[in-house]
Amino acid sequence: MEIVTAPHLAVRNEWLALHREAPLQPELPIIDAHHHLWDRQTGRYLTHEFSDDIQTSGHRVVSSVYVQCRSMLRRDGPETLKPLGEIEFASGIAAMFASGHYANALGCEAIIGGLSLLAGDAMQPAIERAIALSGGRLRGMRNPLAWHPDPRVTSSPVTPPAGLAQSAPFRRGAACLARHALSLDVWVYHTQLEEIADLAREIPTLQIVIDHCGGPVGVGPCSERDPDMFQQWRNGMRRLAELPNVCVKISGFGMTVRGFHFAAAETPPDSQMLAQAWMPWFETIVSLFGAERCMFASNFPVDKGMFSYGVFWNACKRLVQQASPDEQAQLFWRTAATCYRLTSVENINDQ
């Protein structure tokens, strides 16, 4: 069991059970484009827990993308190679899902690893080992980048130095990813978006995936209802949208750094409440990037402290009620399938 301190809400299954919903549009295929798995002192979320969430939700989740979270790092060996353990772990989970015994979904069909880009050009041998260990499922890397000068703004067990994405070693590592046709998943706050835009301009062959709506901060010096914060975030996202090698995950609404307070209520939020609260962010992102560059993702179990899996997907489906069938397909599975080169789409019938 891993000892990891993270500023995430505790998952209270008894509280979540106080509100359940039947799935909306249960036939609509879904690729969960961002989730984690771990076994920590604060809780376990592994194959059975993820599979149970999928099955009890009633939604048609056909595939998922595993994203690094420092799970099962190798105990021994060079520090730079310890993240290979997480890739092995996720690949093993993927093999379990591929057996057909779990939720009829291809869980962890794509893997985003955590090799440090600070190794620069020296990443190449490690990347080749990672691809082999993943069983061909490796699609990219993610490094801790979210930094804010105010200590009240925190979202990760690892706080990186300021400006890491601007450093020369990191950018050489990013270029190495591009040479291997691997993407870079990025979790930063809205105050850092210009750094990522600069990186995207410098390496136009690198596919960059912006996690969690571009990290609009709603705590500490910022307020979720602050119009200045919203405009600053929108300006940063607009500059990113101008770059064709950038796409966005619509996710992370249950992170404490976002500033929503649904977890403080006596009962969990319903999907209508969530959709209403999220709509300004959703509409802005889709208007800037287009549905073909946006994908929904659960960010479970991080976001499970604020709402259940089924309610989350119902909220997403409420967000797209005015969207065309093609736009809905883009948001729920096609963008993720294209971005991460997922073969499960061959079996999807979204008609």
Regions found by a protein language model. Give the residues of each.
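Mid-to-C-terminal alpha-helical segments outside catalytic/metal-binding sites
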Residues: 1-29, 45-53, 62-63, 283-284, ...
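Mid-domain alpha/beta scaffold segments of enzyme catalytic cores
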Residues: 2-180, 200, 220-224
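Catalytic pocket-lining loop regions of alpha/beta-barrel enzymes
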Residues: 6-8, 161-295
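Acidic active-site catalytic centers that drive phospho-/nucleotidyl reactions
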Residues: 32, 212, 299
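Tryptophan-centric aromatic hotspots in well-structured domains and transmembrane helices
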Residues: 38, 66, 89, 114, ...
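Active-site-proximal loop/turn and secondary-structure-junction residues that shape catalytic pockets
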Residues: 70-71, 117, 145-147, 188-192, ...
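Short, electropositive alpha-helical surface patch
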Residues: 80-95, 125-133, 195-209, 263-281, ...
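Short helix-capping segments at alpha-helix termini
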Residues: 97-104, 134-135, 202-207, 243, ...
